[in-house]
Amino acid sequence: MISLSDLRKFKAEGRKFSCLTCYDASMAKAMELAEIDTILIGDSLGMAIQGRDSTLPVTVEDMAYHTAAVRRGNQHALIMTDLPFMSYATLNDALQNAKTVMQAGAQMIKIEGGAWLSETVQVLTRNGVPVCVHLGLTPQSVHVFGGYKLQARTREAADQLIADCTAVVEAGAAVLLLECVPAQLGQEIAELFPNTPVIGIGAGNATDGQVLVVQDMLGLTFGRVARFVRNFMKEQSGETAILDAFKAFHAAVQDQSFPAKEHTFQVEL
């Protein structure tokens, strides 16, 4: 089973690692066979599984249910679970809700925010809960951002994001996840923290790992598709098409053919 120590080793060795969202045991098993390194039980299940307009209605109970299902189906990947909207507003909430999803099978929890999360990160880490902090475009704050848009478009905004990353890493964050930021910034942050694995989604191909929502990479997105998405399913055929799509994603992340230039945001900072 892959651990946080393995992710740190991968970064030190320059080996890129793969991450996909997953919500059920059957997909989890296919990801195990494809040797996907990391699985995120994301609150994206609100949209991808529950058919909602955002992640905001998702509950801790939802996250624990799907975490347990994924863990039963996959004994290979590191399992990371989102704490959903407003479930870590207080330190006590963060501890109790982290306990719930960790007992369901998570090895790490993910929370969204910046420097203001430092105390939460510190308390969780001291209590044995590895924390991934999600920065950049954070879907739980979609109404604050006014929609799903590229973040850190200016040098000033990029420096603020770097300051947020620094604060949470110093507080003990084990992993960073950057969403929807310029490729140059993704590279800067990955290089700035040599002992902290950085996962990207729409953050260029210089981050240490890459994550996609599984429905997106299988072509099950109806309507507008984000720039950073590649449909790996359309390249496959036959009864093993889904498994082959997972294998193709894993290989493309490792050889850095994904994300390609067309999947990234090129902004001069």
From Swiss-Prot:
Homodecamer; pentamer of dimers. It comes from Acinetobacter baumannii (strain AYE). It is found in: Cytoplasm. NCBIfam families: panB, PRK00311.1. The keyword Magnesium applies. The lineage of its organism: Bacteria, Pseudomonadati, Pseudomonadota, Gammaproteobacteria, Moraxellales. Pathway: Cofactor biosynthesis; (R)-pantothenate biosynthesis; (R)-pantoate from 3-methyl-2-oxobutanoate: step 1/2. It comes from the Bacteria. This is 3-methyl-2-oxobutanoate hydroxymethyltransferase. One of its GO terms (cellular component) is cytoplasm. Its cofactor is Mg(2+). 3-methyl-2-oxobutanoate binds at residues 43-44, 82, 110. Binds 1 Mg(2+) ion per subunit. InterPro entries: Pantoate_hydroxy_MeTrfase (IPR003700), Pyrv/PenolPyrv_kinase-like_dom (IPR015813), Pyrv_kinase-like_dom_sf (IPR040442). HAMAP family: PanB. Keywords: Cytoplasm, Magnesium, Metal-binding, Pantothenate biosynthesis, Transferase. The active site is at residue 179. Its EC number is 2.1.2.11. Mg(2+) binds at residues 43, 82, 112.
